[in-house]
C-alpha cells in the first residue's frame, strides 16, 4: 500500500529519451513518456491514493510540458506539484496541470515564454576559410542553420511560430490556473519570479514544503497519514 506516489520531474524536460551535451555527455533530463506513464499508472493503482509531482527543472520541450500537464489534469486522484529550486518554462507548464502547486519562498517560478535563439557561425566560418554551399528544395528548408545568415523572411517565419507557441502557452496556463488571459500575458515576459510573488500572482497556491503537500492530501481526505513512495 502506498498512500502517496511521488514522481520526479528533474533536469531538462524532453518528450522521450535523454539529452546529450555537445561532447556527447548525458544531461540530467526527464521524459514526458516516463512521467505520463507514471501518473497514469498511479491513477489506476488501487493501492495509491494521491500523486505528488516533485519539480526541479528549468524547462525544455513545450510539447512535453503540455503532455504532463494534461496527464495531471485528467487524473482522478488528488495531485500536487511541489516546486523545489525551480519550475520554469515547460516545467512550470507541466506543474500547472496539478490540483495544487506548492513552492519555496525562494523557488524560481514561471518563465512563461518561448525561445528559438541560437549561435550564428557564419563569421567564424569565414575566418576559418569555410564556405557554406546552400542546396535545398525550398527557400525555408534550412532556416536556422547556424552556418548561414538568417534572412528577414526566415526571421519573420520563425517569429510567427514562436508567437503561436507563446500564445498557446499563455492560454494553457490561464486555463489550468483559473487566471484571466490578460493577467497571464502581463507575467509572460520570460522571467521567473520568487515564491511569494508567484503566490501573489496566482501562479502557485501555497508557500511550503513536502510536509505541506502531505497535509493537503490529508485535508482532501485522500490519506490519513504521511507515507510517500517513489517511482
Language model: regions and residue ranges:
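A generic structural-conservation signal
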Residues: 52, 81, 134, 183, ...
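Glycine-rich beta-to-alpha transition loops that act as phosphate-gripper elements at the mouths
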Residues: 82-88, 187-191
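Short N-terminal micro-motifs specific to bacterial/archaeal maturation
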Residues: 26, 112, 189, 204-205
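Short catalytic/ligand-gating loop segments at beta-alpha or beta-beta junctions
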Residues: 137-139, 178-191
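Small-residue-centered hinge/linker elements
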Residues: 1-78, 86-176, 226-231
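Extracytoplasmic/luminal low-complexity segments enriched in Pro/Gly and acidic/polar residues
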Residues: 181-183, 191-231
Amino acid at each position: 500500500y502506498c498512500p502517496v506516489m511521488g514522481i520526479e520531474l528533474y533536469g531538462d524536460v524532453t518528450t522521450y529519451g535523454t539529452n546529450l551535451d555537445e561532447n556527447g555527455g548525458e544531461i540530467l533530463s526527464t521524459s514526458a513518456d516516463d512521467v505520463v506513464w507514471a501518473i497514469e499508472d498511479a491513477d489506476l493503482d488501487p493501492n495509491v491514493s494521491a500523486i505528488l509531482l516533485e519539480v526541479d527543472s528549468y524547462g525544455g520541450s513545450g510539447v512535453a510540458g503540455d503532455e504532463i500537464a494534461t496527464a495531471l489534469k485528467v487524473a482522478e486522484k488528488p495531485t500536487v506539484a511541489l516546486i523545489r529550486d525551480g519550475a520554469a518554462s515547460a516545467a512550470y507548464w507541466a506543474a500547472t496541470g496539478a490540483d495544487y502547486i506548492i513552492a519555496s519562498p525562494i523557488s524560481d517560478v514561471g518563465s512563461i515564454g518561448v525561445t528559438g535563439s541560437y549561435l550564428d557561425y557564419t563569421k567564424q566560418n569565414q575566418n576559418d576559410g569555410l564556405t557554406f554551399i546552400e542546396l535545398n528544395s525550398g527557400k525555408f528548408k534550412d532556416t536556422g542553420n547556424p552556418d548561414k545568415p538568417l534572412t528577414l523572411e526566415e526571421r519573420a517565419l520563425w517569429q510567427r511560430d514562436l508567437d503561436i507557441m507563446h500564445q498557446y502557452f499563455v492560454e494553457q496556463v490561464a486555463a489550468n490556473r483559473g487566471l484571466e488571459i490578460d493577467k497571464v500575458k502581463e507575467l509572460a515576459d520570460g522571467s521567473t519570479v520568487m515564491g511569494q510573488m508567484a503566490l501573489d500572482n496566482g501562479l502557485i497556491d501555497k508557500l511550503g514544503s513536502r510536509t505541506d503537500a502531505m497535509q493537503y492530501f490529508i485535508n482532501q481526505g485522500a490519506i490519513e497519514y504521511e507515507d510517500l513512495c517513489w517511482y
